[in-house]
Each structure stands twice: as structure tokens, then as C-alpha cells.
Amino acid sequence: MAGSTPSSVPDVLAPGLTCIFCGINPGRVSAAAAAHFANPRNDFWRLLHDAGFTPRLYDPQEQFSLLELGLGVTNAAYRTTPGSGDLRRGDFDQAEFEARIRAAAPRAVAFVGKEAYRGLFNERPELGAQRRSIGRTGLFVLPSTSPANAAVPYQERLRWFTELRLWLEPVERQAVRGLVLDREGQVLLVRFEHPISGDAWWATVGGGIDPGETDEDALRRELREEAGLADFEIGPVVHTREATFPWAGQLIHQHERFHLIRVETHEVTPTIDLVPEGVTDVRWWSPAELTAQSEEVVPEDLLQIIRANDA
């Protein structure tokens, strides 16, 4: 993926990076050098080192060495201008940018300056972690490192770079989920929808384990709240999964255990308002319906798991 860009400054990208830094667009100095943040008065590379992202101070021409550290660099707009104020609204392509990020699937994107974020999403962000995400990629906004932002003290900008480095370490979370199958072989799933991006996906019933809870405690609570289901036996663990994803401005590393639960039949009747949890629907699915529908299903191998346990 590295270098595949319509700009004179190549993207520094690879699949599965920890963080991609996103500037607003190439300035003339960067375009001439074919390197990101190449203006010697730009503090990006110094801040990257002082915040602990790089073991030493890198030169802009060493930008592809960032990939070895799990880091990348791109721009919100590709057109070179004397300054970011010379950009037009049409220089930003949100759909193309999101496709670029989904293809790379990093843990996070850090926008170097509010204007890079604003140009893409037409929103005025605060500095720090954002509630918006792109798929399973979290978003973070840093102060600009441009010499035009020199009025913001270096130590203040360094504080935000350091906060980003700490934020990139996800919060560990234990979770339990139910592979709930009825006598017809249907599976009970909940539909999540991100409140800002609109990304939607279906997942098995379940959730995080609260302090002091056992798997059974948490699973009974979740099934009662999400489906009104109370009369059931909890079976063995039939699948485990680990996933890192953004939620409500945090990065979560979730350890999930899936218990097999068989029921005769059940009419779904949630006992709480699920909208604040991001849940928009709870329903039974047949394997044929799951195969035919187009929205994302988590875990990706759910059909295989169902078939392996549909005795």
C-alpha cells in the first residue's frame, strides 16, 4: 500500500498498523521533498520522538521506517498548496478517505490538526479521542504541528502526543456471549449501529462482565435485558474470540467466551431501553437468512460455529 497516492508525497501505509497520522495536505516543502512534514520548522518528527513513538529523532526522508514501528502517515487532502487555507471543500473526499482507512484497518487514525478532521467530516472536533470511528478504527485529534500553530506551546502539543500514545493501549475487557439456538436452528442476534458513522453489524447476545460477576451472572443479565429471556440452561464454551475496537471514545481489547444455549422458542421482549447501548434490533435468524443478508455479522465465522453445534 505504501506509495499508492495521487500526490507527490507518498502514503506511508500498510495493513494492520497501530496508528496512522493524518496531516491536512502537502505543503510546498513536503511536495518538493516527497516526504511528510518536511518543513524543518514543523515539529511533527520531534514530537513523535519526544512522546516515545520513535526510538530516536527521524528525518522526514526516513518516513517509511515508521512502518517497522507500526506507524503510518497519510493526508486528508492530496493537493499541494502554499498553505492549508488555500484548500477548497472539494479537495476533501470523505468516502475515499474512509475506504483508504478501512483497507488499511489500523487501530487508530490521529489527525495532526483539527482542520484535517474538519475538512473530511465537516465537524468541529475537540482535541483528543473522538466518538466517531471508521469501522474498527478509532479516531484521535492532535494539535497542529505546523509553524503556523507555534502560538501553542511545545509542551502543550507534546502533552497531546503523549496522551495519544497512552490511549493507543486498549482497555482490557472480559465479555461473555450466548450462542442461543432454538429448536428450528435459528440463532438470536442483536443489531448494533454506530450513532455517528452509521456502521451497523449483527452479533450474538451478551456483553461485558461486571466486577464480581461470573460468566453465568453476566450472561443471564444480558439475555434478560436484551431479549427478555430467563428460562434457559447455560451450556459449554464453544468458541473464543479476541477483538480490538473503538467504542464511546475508548479503544477496547475484548476477550470473549461464547456459551451454547438451547431454547425451545422465545418471543423477543427486551426489558430495558437498548438504544443507549447502540442496539437497534434483536431478532431470530435462520442460517439461510444470514447467508442472504448484506450487513456485517460478528464473528465472521458465525455460520460455521452454528453448523458445528446444531446437533
Feature roles, as predicted:
Residues 1-18, 39-40, 47, 83-98, ...:
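C-terminal capping/extension of enzyme domains
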Residues 24, 111-116, 192-193:
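Short, well-ordered beta-to-alpha junction loops that form the rim of enzyme active sites
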Residues 17, 27-32, 197-199:
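Short N-terminal binding/cap micro-motifs at the start of the first secondary-structure element
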Residues 131-132, 209-233, 241-297:
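Unchanged
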Residues 68-123:
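Internal catalytic-core helix/loop-beta-alpha segment
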Residues 30-90:
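Short, surface-exposed acidic-centric catalytic microdomains
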Residues 114-169, 268-311:
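A generic hydrophobic-segment detector
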Residues 48, 169-187, 208-211:
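Conserved N-terminal beta-strand and adjoining loop/helix that marks the start
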